């Protein structure tokens, strides 16, 4: 029997959990021309959700583009990826090359065959520099939208900072503001950076798009999913175990799947029974496997950042009060604020009102057991 749980990759049925309301709302907004800014901490399932939505929209006749800025190392690489995504919707590579070449003068696509004989797109900057204006690249979906509208997704959009971010941001905004047949989705998990781009008056994308925070999946839906996955794969799971998995993982979809998968593997070695002892072994195995990564994360912090992180590990709300500072010997307050801002920017923590949460619950478990 195969493990019924998947993590670490974008998933579809049968591993995709719920999000029915988000699928309906996002699809309706995008089809009406509304652009979106979707944010949440990492591992909440943003990518799986949007890929599923794009798949559905393609079936309805829309053209789609998906660009993950985590993989974009240069302006040239962006142009290559953008052209490649757009060409997927053309009848043939030959027609695609002819069509796009007719619409671009400065940045032209070049098609060659890779080592496996498959077409590969590169670009030729006619001006000789990849610092040339990318406007004609940005404008392609609008120019090609004669019969079909386009949906363009920029994942981890805050990572444009690696591409001379301010200039790239302004160039893109100057183009997309005129696109009447293209809806855009800007997504990101470094929420502090992404929200700054869309909520600060001095930024190019100020108030562009509908802001949407992707929340956690309801725990009852997660519990039903886990119970069904175990039962259908021959695991005798104790009734309270699914809720315990969800609690340990703080209902973060990726980590719920991660622990559920590890517990399934342990149960296979325990006569297909999943109880508290087996779950504890699964947690222990995960922490052991991740120890080098956790140590690296911790050691890259300053001494004060480590001190603040350990305090939040024990108590994660009202962290700027004098009582809190006294309990954990955090002085001065300005240093604590700087350390917290750093922990937010790097994605170790996320903030919900006055509560600060670990984005990786296993990192928190490791800190509590090893450092606190």
Regions found by a protein language model. Give the residues of each.
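A short, basic N-terminal segment
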Residues: 1-36, 41, 350
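C-terminal leucine-rich, beta-strand-based interaction scaffolds used for sensing/assembly
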Residues: 2-3, 177, 288, 292-372
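Short, locally clustered residues in the helix-turn-helix/winged-helix DNA-binding domain
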Residues: 30-31, 158, 250, 264, ...
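P-loop NTPase nucleotide-binding core
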Residues: 34-35, 41-44, 48-151
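Conserved Walker B catalytic segment
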Residues: 124-191, 199
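Helix-loop-helix "sensor" segment of P-loop NTPases
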Residues: 196-247, 269-271
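C-terminal helical "lid" of AAA+/P-loop NTPase domains
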Residues: 242-248, 254-269, 307-310, 341
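Conserved C-terminal helix/linker of AAA+ ATPases
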Residues: 266-289
